[in-house]
Amino acid sequence: MFKKGQKVIVDFTDEIGAVAKVDYRYNQIEVKYPDGTYQVVGFHKVRKVED
């Protein structure tokens, strides 16, 4: 589904970040934003960025 380094859009805030870690056991990913912060979110709150 998701791969490390892939760009994603989180929630409906339209913030773009990169996938830092994927946890399929709990259906969560850790997203790293350009400002250096991290956030853990569920798969249902993330959309892939289309190139």
UniProtKB/Swiss-Prot annotation:
This is SPbeta prophage-derived uncharacterized protein YorQ. The lineage of its organism: Bacteria, Bacillati, Bacillota, Bacilli, Bacillales. The gene is yorQ.
